[in-house]
Curated annotation (Swiss-Prot):
Gene source species: Ruthia magnifica subsp. Calyptogena magnifica
Self-association and partners: Monomer.
GO MF: 4 iron, 4 sulfur cluster binding; metal ion binding; N6-isopentenyladenosine methylthiotransferase activity
SMART domains: Elp3
Function of the molecule: Catalyzes the methylthiolation of N6-(dimethylallyl)adenosine (i(6)A), leading to the formation of 2-methylthio-N6-(dimethylallyl)adenosine (ms(2)i(6)A) at position 37 in tRNAs that read codons beginning with uridine.
Protein's UniProt name: tRNA-2-methylthio-N(6)-dimethylallyladenosine synthase
PROSITE patterns: MTTASE_N (PS51449), MTTASE_RADICAL (PS01278), RADICAL_SAM (PS51918), TRAM (PS50926)
Family that this chain belongs to: Belongs to the methylthiotransferase family. MiaB subfamily.
CDD domains in the cross-refs: Radical_SAM
Record's subcellular location: Cytoplasm
């Protein structure tokens, strides 16, 4: 039996893509996933270019795999994802032993690319197979039906981003925004529900820009998609990520009132609490607009958990800009954040800006942001002690007599119960809260 090993860096979209890669190659070549790279026949690296040192991580991993290839000349090594899309030729220059290079939009072509390597044209030397083109949404037309044994699943509803924020590489590596047809998404959710999935997380780089074509020629927005997906038998909870504030519409806010299955958690990145920095980032909105949207949402869902991304030390960020960010963190009471020190992404507009914030200052500011939000996380978790929370039971916990699930606001929750409860939403009386974790007792 031929084996496939996939190493995934980056976001949920990459995780989704890696799952699809496994499905595609199992369907076409009978490759079976393994957790042991040394035993695999095909090694694939699905890369992310969002953060600094993406290339270094890539070549460090490839260096390890080269040792395996030195021992087994038939081993096939492939690189996909956003770094592959951005740096395809460079990868071959530095790692000529790589056999396949593919982009986020061409993973569906992996079977033919693999065949090119496995069965080269007679009389021709074996050459690497490269395809980092942007065939828009075509990849979704050539994927096998989804398969999963989990009660949660990601569903990609769109690709790319057209915002061109000055710091972001995504439009250059995944292309412009392209939405999947409405019925295709709904059918995928239906198939997953039949397989036992109870929670779907709708994915997109800018998911609330979704504009799915319906059979009648009309366009469905994210709010309508959520509404219809919630009506599918078996689906008990819906999430979506990642959103952009400029397209967090009133119809989407109303969905929190109309769709009880829509989880009380929103990841809405703002990146900075300074209007000046938001302008330099070309985010397209001001802080007051962001706060207004959150205020409207909390009128409908007072207990909703809000998380964000923050870029610390963006070029031009002075002390007042940073204090504005800290003020916003206090005012919103962010539950969680993905916070990073700014690093220039080659090819973006911001890479031409003078990076004028001292690294020690960046580190100090990042530490303060993380400390403040960690305190918020702890405070919210402790405030949940004594409450009854609806938990989607996902699996058996490491302690075998315990089950594991998550609250609507993404708290990992452990409690004693029978594994027959997996896939159900149960009521749990919370007895302990620490960090992002809760402990509780099952209410019969």
């Amino acid at each position: 039996m031929k084996k496939l090993y996939i190493r995934t860096f980056g976001c949920q979209m990459n995780e989704y893509d890696s799952n699809k890669i496994a499905d595609v190659l199992n369907h076409s070549h009978g490759l079976v996933l393994t957790d042991d790279a040394a035993s695999a026949n095909v090694l694939l690296l699905n890369t992310c270019s969002i953060r600094e040192k993406a290339q270094e991580k890539l070549f460090h991993q490839l260096g390890r795999w080269r040792k395996l290839k030195d021992k087994n000349s038939n081993l096939i090594i492939g690189v996909g994802g956003c770094v592959a899309s951005q740096e395809g030729e460079l990868i071959l220059e530095r790692a000529p032993y790589v056999d396949i290079i593919f982009g986020p939009q061409t993973l569906h072509r992996l079977p033919s690319m693999l065949n090119e390597v496995l069965t080269p044209t007679p009389g021709m030397s074996v050459k690497p197979s490269i395809d980092i083109s942007f065939p828009e949404i075509e990849k979704f037309d050539h994927l096998p039906k989804p398969k999963t044994s989990s009660v949660t699943a990601f569903v990609s509803i769109m690709e790319g981003c057209s915002k061109y924020c000055t710091f972001c590489i995504v439009p250059y590596t995944r292309g412009e925004e392209v939405s999947r047809p409405f019925i295709d998404v709904i059918n995928e959710v239906k198939i997953l529900a039949i397989q036992g999935v109870r929670e779907v997380n709708l994915l997109g780089q800018n998911v609330n820009a979704y504009q799915g074509l319906m059979d009648d020629g009309e366009i469905a927005d994210l709010a309508l998609l959520i509404n219809i997906a919630a009506q599918i038998d078996g689906i008990k909870r819906i999430r979506y990520t990642t959103s952009h504030p400029t397209q967090f519409s009133d119809s989407l806010i109303e969905a929190y009132m109309e769709v009880p299955k829509l989880a009380s958690h929103l990841h809405l990145p703002i990146q900075s609490g300074s209007d000046k920095i938001l302008r330099l980032m070309k985010r397209g909105h001001m802080v007051i607009e962001y706060k207004s949207k959150i205020r409207k949402l909390r009128k409908i869902r007072p207990d909703i958990s809000i998380s964000s991304d923050f870029i610390i030390g963006f070029p031009g960020e002075n002390e007042q800009d940073f204090l504005d960010t800290m003020t916003l963190i206090d005012e919103i009471g962010f539950d969680k954040s993905f916070s990073f020190i700014y690093s220039a992404r080659p090819g973006t507009l911001a890479s031409s800006y003078l990076d004028d914030v001292d690294m020690d200052v960046k580190k100090q500011r990042l530490a303060l942001v993380q400390k403040t939000i960690d305190k918020n996380t702890e405070r919210i978790s402790k405030s949940m002690v004594g409450s009854v929370q609806k938990i989607l039971v996902e699996n058996v916990a490491k302690k075998r007599d315990n089950l594991f699930g998550r609250t609507e606001n993404m708290r990992n929750t452990h409690f004693k119960g029978d594994k027959s409860l997996i896939g159900q939403i149960v009521n749990i009386k919370i007895t302990q809260g620490r960090g992002n974790s809760l402990v509780g007792n099952l209410i019969a």
